Curated annotation (Swiss-Prot):
It comes from Oceanobacillus iheyensis (strain DSM 14371 / CIP 107618 / JCM 11309 / KCTC 3954 / HTE831). This is NAD kinase 1. The lineage of its organism: Bacteria, Bacillati, Bacillota, Bacilli, Bacillales. NAD(+) binds at residues 45-46, 122-123, 149, 151, 186. GO terms for cellular component: cytoplasm. Belongs to the NAD kinase family. Its EC number is 2.7.1.23. Keywords: ATP-binding, Cytoplasm, Kinase, NAD, NADP, Nucleotide-binding, Transferase.
């Protein structure tokens, strides 16, 4: 089996990376940066997102697993004290995988400009580049739903619903659900302007279009990176046909993670 390790880069993560690379190689596994069957993230959720986007072109062939060297993460099941056990599990046990849905974002430019298709593991956050209010015609399944005015719109996956989406008051969704969630960021509501004011959860066969009603430059944050877009005609969001695969060597129920991160005094 081929493997690759993506490290946060701090001393602790680098030591774990070096140890895992040495021992897994001694067990007969091959360190392969180009075509890994398993990508091991050592760091936090940010490192995991970096690893995902680095190998997003290999989703059908590559599975991911994470070791957290900081605070508990939603994508990093293993701790530094478990590394030796994980090494043995990877070397000796054919791993099982669980698949979770992704968000597909397609940004189309006006007047024959290019089309940019991006996959997100967590979310896409859409704002104007100059900090002014965004004004979108929101379409769902090809029908006008509302005109949104506000600071921005967040579209998240179920596995990303505990991140930016939660901070905006969105619901936490179990990552096995094939859906996306649309959450408002500081919408403008008064006697003249009105939005739904609640998160919307769309199933996989529903598509959302955001069409700018005012010419603006947009900052679109996809997971851990941000891109600037001009002359945007529409932003299309839906559940992607691709899925991310997580390697599983032990059970770590999702609701336990939620409890430990947000509720438990020991989390």
């Amino acid at each position: 089996m081929n493997f690759k390790i993506v490290s946060k880069g701090d001393d602790r993560s680098e030591k774990i990376k070096a140890m895992m690379r040495q021992y897994l190689s001694e067990f007969g596994l091959t360190y392969d940066k180009e075509t890994p069957d398993l990508v091991i993230s050592v760091g936090g959720d940010g490192t995991f997102l970096e690893a995902f986007h680095r190998y997003v072109h290999r989703l059908e062939d590559t599975a991911f697993i994470g070791i957290h060297t900081g605070h508990l993460g939603f994508y990093t099941d293993w701790t530094p004290k478990d590394v030796e056990r994980l090494i043995i599990e990877i070397a000796k046990t054919p791993f099982q995988t669980v698949e979770y849905p992704l968000l597909e974002v397609i940004i189309r430019a006006k007047a024959g400009g290019k089309e940019d298709r991006i996959l997100a593991l967590n979310e896409a956050m859409i704002k104007t580049a100059d900090g002014s209010s965004v004004v979108f015609d929101v379409e769902i399944k090809g029908e006008h739903f509302e005109t949104f005015r506000g600071d921005g719109i967040c579209i998240s996956t179920p596995s990303g619903s505990t991140a930016y989406n939660k901070a905006l008051g969105g619901a936490i969704l179990h990552p096995s659900l094939e859906a996306i969630q649309i959450t408002e960021n500081a919408s403008i509501n008064n006697r003249v302007f009105r939005t739904i004011g609640s998160p919307l959860i769309l199933p996989k066969h529903h598509t959302c279009f955001l069409k700018p009603m005012v010419d603006s430059s947009f900052l679109i944050q996809i997971d851990h990176f941000t891109k600037n877009y001009q002359n945007v005609k529409s932003i299309q969001c839906r559940v992607a046909k691709e899925k991310v695969r997580f390697a599983r060597f032990k059970q770590f129920p999702f609701w336990n993670r939620v409890r430990d991160s947000f509720v438990s005094e020991e989390g």
